[in-house]
A protein has these predicted regions:
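Acidic, divalent-metal-coordinating active-site segment for phosphoryl/phosphodiester hydrolysis
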Residues: 155, 175-183
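Generic structural signal for small/hydrophobic residues in well-ordered secondary structure
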Residues: 12-15, 56, 102, 110, ...
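A structural signal for isolated positions on well-ordered beta-strands in alpha/beta enzyme cores
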Residues: 107-109, 139, 171
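Short beta-strand/turn micro-motifs composed of small residues
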Residues: 112, 174
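Surface-exposed amphipathic alpha-helices with a cationic face
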Residues: 100-104, 160, 180
Length: 183
């Protein structure tokens, strides 16, 4: 497919638009007493927590309470919130500038597995850099609001139905191969 045939661009947020430093996140978790051993032992619990958190299936307070149970005594929800801010990553202004330019030629959508708290922090960061989501994207699709997550087919179907985009003329940018394959 040539770029002349492309009409729509769909971007993931974490790992594509914003840089996420997994090492920093792990170090931040370890600072709260969530060691590699604990992560290994509680891998199912952590995956379930993150799935529920990212998809808005449980209240944030409930997620934080369960996360506290994995941390060393004396850890507060504020400590965990600081660690979660690490997930907001580093947002290069050049990428935001590129999105604005791309919107002049293509429909540009965001499709991301993210929770409300991290999204609000990300929106705030974009504003600090001088941009609004309306300037950057034609529409935003977030897992927590849709109660679906990539790579489930349902999230792509809903986005396609709402936007009328043609998957055959759409490029997907995601840091996970399974998400671009599903799209």
């Amino acid at each position: 497919m040539s770029m002349k045939q492309i009409e729509t661009l769909v971007f993931d947020y974490g790992g594509v638009i914003v840089n996420i430093d997994d090492v920093s996140v792990v170090k931040a978790m370890e600072s709260l007493g969530v060691t590699a051993f604990k992560r290994l032992i509680h891998v199912r619990k952590i995956k379930r927590l993150m799935h529920q958190y990212i998809n808005g299936l449980v209240a944030e307070s409930e997620t934080l309470k369960e996360m506290l149970s994995l941390c060393r005594k004396g850890t507060t929800t504020e400590d965990i919130e600081k660690v979660l801010e690490e997930l907001c990553g580093n947002l290069p202004v050049e990428r935001l500038e590129a999105l604005v330019k791309l919107r002049k030629r293509y429909k540009v959508y965001l499709l991301s597995n993210i929770n409300d708290t991290l999204w609000q922090k990300s929106v705030s960061l974009m504003k600090q850099l001088g941009y609004s989501t309306d300037e950057l994207f034609d529409e935003v699709f977030l897992s927590y609001a849709m109660r679906k997550e990539k790579p489930s087919v349902e999230i792509y179907e809903e986005m396609t139905q709402q936007t009328g985009l043609n998957p055959a003329t759409t490029l997907y940018f995601d840091d996970r191969a399974e998400n671009t394959e599903a799209g």
